[in-house]
Amino acid sequence: MKTLLLTLVVVTIVCLDLGDSLICYQAYNTPQTCAPGENLCYTKTWCDYWCHVKGKRIDLGCAATCPTAKPGEDVTCCSRDKCNPHPLQRPR
């Protein structure tokens, strides 16, 4: 009986996802827990028509794979909690 119980406990532990979910910034100073399978944080920046007035557009979030940069975009990815802060949050 003890062997059966021990086996059930081991199977339960192996089947459960005991790892922590990744936390990424989704907007300025707004961290959010990523969905299962999304193991990367990304920062995407690009210029639009108003870039000369407002600066670059910034998109932050979680991803399963690093987004591919289109022409004119810069994309960076990382895999630690809160590793993609908004550029205005970064220490100077």
Curated annotation (Swiss-Prot):
Subcellular location: Secreted
Keywords: Acetylcholine receptor inhibiting toxin, Disulfide bond, Ion channel impairing toxin, Neurotoxin, Postsynaptic neurotoxin, Secreted, Signal, Toxin
Signal peptide: 1-21
Alphabetical list of PROSITE patterns matching this protein: SNAKE_TOXIN
Any GO CC annotation of this UniProt entry: extracellular region
UniProt family annotation: Belongs to the three-finger toxin family. Long-chain subfamily. Type II alpha-neurotoxin sub-subfamily.
UniProt-recorded name of the protein: Long neurotoxin 73
Gene3D superfamilies: CD59
InterPro entries: Snake_3FTx, Snake_toxin-like_sf, Snake_toxin_con_site, Toxin_cobra-type
